[in-house]
Regions:
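Short, charge-rich binding segments
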Residues: 47-51, 62, 71, 137, ...
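Active-site neighborhood of divalent metal-dependent phosphoester/pyrophosphate hydrolases
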Residues: 114
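Short amphipathic alpha-helical interface segments
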Residues: 1-22
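Radical SAM/AdoMet-radical enzyme domain recognition
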Residues: 91, 95-110, 119-245
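Conserved, mostly hydrophobic/aromatic
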Residues: 65, 69, 111, 171
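Canonical Radical SAM [4Fe-4S] cluster-binding loop centered on the CxxxCxxC motif
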Residues: 51-52, 56-87
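N-terminal [4Fe-4S]-dependent radical SAM core
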Residues: 16-58, 102
Length: 245
């Protein structure tokens, strides 16, 4: 890879590692210089907009967060959260989609932030409950996903996730325990690594899919293999619910 970068020629990579080159090519990381990528994006976007089989909403229930990661690009707004009026408007929108998309097969509700679980009971749960009940006993496949730091997950929320068709969460670790706790800490003397790992394991045991996204640097890469020890307590039958990215 370094050789191809230095030579500014991806064909150098093909000579060294054919499989890696083919993977980059198939995923469009490597694109022929004659391909109009802007036009391709426009075509994909048009196709998505016109697809009445699938509808996807992403909601930021708050721009506040319980961490202050140094690299975060979000502007945290303390105490910000969806108003009752906005929650009702979202529910109305979901109902309109259901009634105006006769070919609708899949409805995906994604939660982002800020930290989407921060005001879960008053913002997220009412919408989740409404959407689930709206699509229950219909031909539409409803499901929901979260991008979360994982700290606020507990068994009560997992029960809700199972009940309301939450089938996927993405949770980030900043490397191994020491590195992670230097970035994501609960207080001056308490890190978050152990609690988040335990929550990830709890999700897997309850058969909810989790992608563990690992942020890495030169320092975190040195200890990255130690992460496996923390997840060794998971039964083999539950490992299929974990993906490391």
């Amino acid at each position: 890879l370094q050789s191809s970068i230095n030579e500014k020629n991806p064909l150098e990579l093909k000579k060294i590692h054919q499989d890696f080159y083919d993977a980059l090519l198939s995923k469009k990381f490597i694109v022929d210089k004659f391909v109009n990528e802007i036009e391709l994006v426009r075509e994909w976007n048009k196709k998505l907009i016109e697809d009445d089989n699938f509808y996807h909403i992403t909601i930021n229930p708050t721009m506040n967060c319980n961490f202050k990661c140094w690299y975060c690009y979000e502007t945290h707004i303390k105490d910000s959260k969806l108003s009752d009026k906005t929650i009702q408007a979202i529910c109305n929108h979901i109902n309109i989609v259901f009634n105006t998309y006769p070919n609708l097969k899949d409805f995906k509700l994604s939660w982002f932030g800020g930290e989407p679980l921060l005001y879960y009971d008053t913002t997220v749960k009412p919408i989740l409950e409404y959407a689930y009940k709206n699509f229950k006993n219909t031909k539409v496949n409803f499901y929901s996903t979260f991008t979360t730091n994982g700290l606020l997950i507990n068994i009560d929320r997992i029960i809700d996730f199972k009940k309301y068709s939450v089938n996927f969460l993405q949770i980030t670790l900043d490397g191994f325990e020491e590195e992670h706790n230097n970035v994501r800490y609960i207080s001056k003397n308490k890190g978050s690594f152990i609690q988040i790992v335990d929550n990830i394991i709890l999700l897997a045991k309850n058969e909810i899919n989790v992608t563990v996204r690992i942020n890495f640097s030169e320092n975190t890469l040195l200890n990255i293999s130690k992460l496996a020890d923390f997840f060794s307590k998971i039964e083999k039958k539950h490992l299929k619910y974990l993906l490391f990215d």
